[in-house]
C-alpha cells in the first residue's frame, strides 16, 4: 500500500517531464489565487444559496443566541459585582473614617484630662494666692499697728521728756 503524496504547489511540476525542467510553471495553470474565476465558472442557484444560508443559520444560530444570553448574564453579573464592590469600598472608607474619629476622640480625652489637671492646678494656685494675700494684709495691718504704737510711744516719751525738763518758775 502506498501513501499518496501531497499535491504540488500551484503551477510547479515536481516530477520528470519531457519538455519542462523541474520547478518550471505548468502551462495552463495560473499563479493567481485559486478562488479567482469561480463565480464565472459555476452557475449559482439562488434557491440553493438560500438553503445553504438557512442551514448555516439553523446550525449556528442557537449556539450564538446561547452565547449572547450567557454574555448578557455575565455582563449583568459584572454590573452587580461592581456595585457590590463599590458598596464594600464605601464601607471600608466609613470604617477608616470611624478609625479617624476614634483617634480624634482618644486625642480629645487626652486633652480633656490635661485641661482638668490644669484647672485643678489653677484652683490650687488661686487658693494659695488668696491665702498669701490675706497673710500679706494681716502682716501689713500688724506693721501699721506696730508703727502706730511706736509713734504713740515716741510721742509719750517726748511729752514725758518735755514735762521732765526744768521749767522756769513763774515770778509772782
UniProtKB/Swiss-Prot annotation:
How would you describe the post-translational modification of this protein? Phosphorylated.
Which cysteines are cross-linked by disulfides? none
Q: Which residues form a coiled coil?
A: 63-167
Q: Which family does it belong to?
A: Belongs to the BLOC1S6 family.
Give the compositionally biased regions (Pro residues).
Answer: 1-10
Protein name according to UniProt: Biogenesis of lysosome-related organelles complex 1 subunit 6
Among the Pfam families in the record, one is: Snapin_Pallidin
- Compositional bias annotation for Basic and acidic residues: 143-164
Amino acid at each position: 500500500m502506498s501513501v499518496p503524496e501531497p499535491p504540488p504547489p500551484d503551477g510547479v511540476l515536481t516530477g520528470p517531464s519531457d519538455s519542462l525542467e523541474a520547478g518550471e510553471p505548468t502551462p495552463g495553470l495560473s499563479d493567481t489565487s485559486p478562488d479567482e474565476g469561480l463565480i464565472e465558472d459555476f452557475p449559482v442557484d439562488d434557491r440553493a444559496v438560500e438553503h445553504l444560508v438557512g442551514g448555516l443559520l439553523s446550525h449556528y444560530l442557537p449556539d450564538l443566541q446561547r452565547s449572547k444570553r450567557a454574555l448578557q448574564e455575565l455582563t449583568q453579573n459584572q454590573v452587580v459585582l461592581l456595585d457590590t464592590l463599590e458598596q464594600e469600598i464605601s464601607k471600608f472608607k466609613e470604617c477608616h473614617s470611624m478609625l479617624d474619629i476614634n483617634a480624634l476622640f482618644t486625642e480629645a480625652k487626652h486633652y480633656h484630662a490635661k485641661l482638668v489637671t490644669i484647672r485643678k492646678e489653677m484652683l490650687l494656685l488661686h487658693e494659695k494666692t488668696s491665702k498669701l494675700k490675706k497673710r500679706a494684709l494681716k502682716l501689713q495691718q500688724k506693721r501699721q499697728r506696730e508703727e502706730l504704737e511706736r509713734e504713740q510711744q515716741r510721742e509719750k516719751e517726748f511729752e514725758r521728756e518735755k514735762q521732765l525738763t526744768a521749767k522756769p518758775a513763774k515770778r509772782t
